[in-house]
Amino acid sequence: MLPTLYTCLLWLSTSGLWTVQAKGSDTDMSTRNPHRDLAPNNVDFAFTLYKHLVASAPGKNVFISPVSISTALAMLSLGARGYTREQLLQGLGFNLTEMSEGEIHRAFRHLHHLLRESNTTLDMTMGNALFLDHSLELLESFSADTKHYYELEALTTDFQDWAGASRQINEYIKNKTQGNIVDLFSESDSSATLILVNYIFFKGMWAHSFDLESTREENFHVNEATTVQVPMMFQSNTIKYLNDSVLPCQLVQLDYTGNETVFFVLPVKGKMDSVITALSRDTIQRWSKSLTMSQVDLYIPKISISGAYDLGGIMGDMGIADLLSNRTHFSGITQEALPKVSKVVHKAALQVDEKGLEADAPTRVSLSAAPGPLTLRFNRPFIIMIFDDFTWSSLFLGKVVNPT
């Protein structure tokens, strides 16, 4: 039987996204905060993975949590040996001559601590669990290292009884995500002997809420042939806005309460691919510096999307070619030999609605001599990106083709 790796089982709910904005010197912050050493690699990995997934799913919604995938693969490397371990870490963008394996895992540990503990105004749960067949026994070194660096919870189950095992795993995920991910596993998977789960539950509140009474049904143009009705949210406020002179798009940056911020990016009609191709650390930094406070009448649809991806083929394209092959070497996980990983599955979901910390409608300021607010209506496919601006982490990336 082959071990199955299910990574990054997520639920993101309500209203806010996150930005990569440096505060002070990169060198000084990196020296004092090991999580900052991860930021460049994690962001580069995030956009590379995102572009691969978008290219593999033309005309479809895409939504992922890159930091969760990075976490799962880094954690898996603790059980890998030889070239398999080297390939995993290099595939995540790490140069082992510049950053040791110990430094990588210590930085992930620090990052997860900050993401969990620094956002006291948000409802966020992060964690890692490993379900293994009762016939297997974890190596003491793997158990100790994964618990120390990733707070991994190891649980045994009977994979010969898949119905019972799936109920156990589903109940665990349901409880950890406050009931928002249910019935995750349903189909029989008799090949599984080990399932690794990395989960995130996040529920945020907009720093400035949308006006609930102003939400109206409007057209959303999925493509030339398809138009759907969506509940379109509205707020009129002074917000960060940019009409990009380099890329064919407009964007706004909205904040959650806490450290999280969201980019909503609206490409010019027919130019989505051009904008996605250009997404990078440099692009985000340029946008962050170029955004200006502007009076905007903003229309964004309520969103309810989810994504499920088998990342095996994508990992191969990104330089982790041996992950699903017979050449893999995961002898550092259990006493018994595990021949290879059979699946790398990522699941995520997103809901965005009007709710914010402020119950009243945002204040609209207008002067008789000043020009009126500009109108920005997200009524065609757009990009959504969520960052944590304290850790510089790319938490969620999405392409919304159909918000329903």
UniProtKB/Swiss-Prot annotation:
Disulfide bonds: none annotated. It comes from the Eukaryota. It comes from Bos taurus. It is found in: Secreted. Proteolytic cleavage leads to an important conformation change. This reduces the affinity for steroids. GO terms for biological process: glucocorticoid metabolic process. Major transport protein for glucocorticoids and progestins in the blood of almost all vertebrate species. InterPro entries: Serpin_CS, Serpin_dom, Serpin_fam, Serpin_sf, Serpin_sf_1, Serpin_sf_2. SUPFAM superfamilies: Serpins (SSF56574). Glycosylation in position Asn-259 is needed for steroid binding. Belongs to the serpin family. This is Corticosteroid-binding globulin. GO terms for cellular component: extracellular space. Glycans are attached at residues 95, 119, 175, 259, 326.
